[in-house]
């Protein structure tokens, strides 16, 4: 009789091709996602050595990081470096025969939204991409993580990856969430508790009633930020919610293949008595709408709190807090709800899905953004954009004063035209608030879509629950 295994153990064991004496393993990779920024050198390496892509049918490419989100981008991209990278991906996809969603394709979008949307991401798979937020796909019970450019070339050439196994960590969210609290609040609260190094060396399995009650889109938000918590990957065991989401998608199994896959997927859970090296438990009812105040995702507090003083920290974190407050232009003791906002960004692979847009639109309906506010919504894919237009969400955003953009990574990172100016303060639904992340000397506060919408209306960080009470 075999020892009880975690979900991570099971997926890992099913993909080990070879294990060396020191524990280093060669893992088979089921899906390789590719974008324009981390792939050019990898494809060039294949050309120089005369190699082909080993499994083009399992390789999916889409430009997303530095594409403009304004009209006309399918015929002209002004930034030379961006244009060269997108053109290179066009050529590489054609030359190597991989699956490709170009800028002109309505299915184009952020790679971590396109993959699940098209049914490429399935339970029990190994998924890699030259991008740290590949952890998103763990919401399906897939082992998914980012890789470097040299590893991108290795996977393209061999469909395998060399790595050592991580340790097992469990994050359990018990009970149910209160109204106004979202998946974004869960994942930020976990990072706030454990720190950005709390998951280092681990693969996290998220579980508990609050996780089970999330939609697939909410689960993707939670797993998306596992990397911000230091983890190699994040996982959620697949269940009926997962299966219902996957069924009928373009690249999901059909007929007898579906039944066979479903039979396997139902074995993907952590066995009773399986060992975790680290366990963190949070009560769902204790989680509130949160916002980051500093320059690390762990600098997070409930929206009802005040800006902390550096003296509240210890060790090296005292100076880090002092630097964060200086960069963010904040004073200890001020209410978070008194922090004025210049810009609101709703989008990214964390919160650019249709449910995120619905949540924001519900707050914005019939309202206008604050005078002088710059606000934009960037759907995570062309299909999300089309659905939002069909549901009337786009018109709500436009009527409120938001810019309604094309799909892409946009203001999540300063690699395209959507950037903050020095000193500009943004309430953002993205995943990182590092110095300069959204533009040189820009200031980022990470929030949920509803919180972002509330800030757009009032002009300052706002408790979304107050807005929800007004709409009842």
Curated annotation (Swiss-Prot):
GO terms for molecular function: 3-isopropylmalate dehydratase activity; 4 iron, 4 sulfur cluster binding; metal ion binding. It catalyses: (2R,3S)-3-isopropylmalate = (2S)-2-isopropylmalate. Its EC number is 4.2.1.33. It comes from the Bacteria. It is an enzyme of class 4 (lyase). GO terms for biological process: L-leucine biosynthetic process. Pfam families: Aconitase. Binds 1 [4Fe-4S] cluster per subunit. Its cofactor is [4Fe-4S] cluster. Pathway: Amino-acid biosynthesis; L-leucine biosynthesis; L-leucine from 3-methyl-2-oxobutanoate: step 2/4. [4Fe-4S] cluster binds at residues 349, 409, 412. Gene3D superfamilies: Aconitase, domain 3. Keywords: 4Fe-4S, Amino-acid biosynthesis, Branched-chain amino acid biosynthesis, Iron, Iron-sulfur, Leucine biosynthesis, Lyase, Metal-binding. Catalyzes the isomerization between 2-isopropylmalate and 3-isopropylmalate, via the formation of 2-isopropylmaleate. Belongs to the aconitase/IPM isomerase family. LeuC type 1 subfamily. This is 3-isopropylmalate dehydratase large subunit. It comes from Cereibacter sphaeroides (strain ATCC 17025 / ATH 2.4.3) (Rhodobacter sphaeroides). The gene is leuC.
């Amino acid at each position: 009789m075999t020892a009880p295994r975690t979900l991570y153990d099971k997926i890992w064991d099913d993909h080990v091709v070879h294990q060396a004496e020191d524990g280093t393993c060669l893992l088979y990779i089921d899906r390789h996602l590719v974008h324009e920024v981390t792939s050019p050198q990898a494809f060039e390496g294949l050309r120089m050595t005369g190699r082909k892509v080993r499994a083009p049918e399992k390789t999916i490419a889409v430009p997303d990081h530095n594409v403009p989100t304004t009209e006309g981008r399918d015929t002209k991209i002004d930034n030379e470096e961006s244009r060269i990278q997108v053109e290179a991906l066009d050529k590489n996809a054609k030359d190597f025969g991989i699956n490709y969603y170009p800028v002109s394709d309505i299915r184009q979008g952020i790679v971590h939204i396109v993959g699940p949307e098209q049914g490429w991401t399935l339970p029990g798979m190994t998924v890699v991409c030259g991008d740290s937020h590949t952890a998103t796909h763990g919401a399906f019970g897939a082992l998914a993580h980012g890789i470097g450019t040299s590893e991108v070339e290795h996977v393209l050439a061999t469909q395998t990856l060399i790595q050592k196994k991580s340790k097992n960590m469990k994050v359990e969210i018990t009970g149910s969430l209160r109204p106004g609290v979202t998946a974004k609040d869960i994942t930020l609260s976990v990072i706030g508790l454990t720190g950005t190094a709390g998951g280092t060396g681990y693969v996290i399995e998220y579980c508990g009633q609050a996780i089970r009650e999330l939609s697939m889109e909410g689960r993707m938000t939670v797993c998306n930020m596992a990397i911000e918590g230091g983890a190699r990957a994040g996982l959620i065991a697949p269940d009926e919610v997962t299966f219902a989401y996957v069924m009928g998608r373009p690249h999901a199994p059909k007929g007898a293949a579906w039944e066979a896959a479903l039979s396997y997927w139902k074995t993907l859970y952590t066995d009773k008595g399986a060992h975790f090296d680290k366990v963190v438990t949070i009560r769902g009812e204790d989680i509130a709408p949160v916002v980051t105040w500093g320059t690390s995702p762990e600098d997070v507090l409930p929206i009802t709190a005040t800006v902390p003083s550096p003296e509240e920290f210890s060790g090296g974190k005292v100076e880090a807090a002092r630097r964060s407050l200086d960069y963010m232009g904040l004073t200890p003791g001020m209410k978070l709800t008194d922090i004025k906002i210049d810009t609101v960004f709703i989008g990214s692979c964390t919160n650019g899905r249709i449910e995120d847009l619905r949540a924001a639109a519900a707050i914005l309906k019939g309202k206008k953004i604050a005078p002088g506010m710059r606000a934009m919504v960037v759907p995570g894919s062309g299909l999300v954009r089309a659905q939002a237009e069909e549901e009337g969400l786009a018109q709500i955003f436009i009527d409120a004063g938001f810019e309604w953009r094309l799909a892409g990574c946009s203001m999540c990172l300063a690699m395209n035209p959507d950037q903050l100016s020095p000193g500009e303060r943004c309430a953002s639904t993205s995943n990182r608030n590092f110095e300069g992340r959204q533009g040189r000397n820009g200031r980022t506060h990470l929030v949920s879509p509803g919180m972002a919408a509330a800030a757009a209306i009032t002009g300052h960080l706002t408790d979304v629950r107050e807005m929800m009470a007004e709409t009842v």
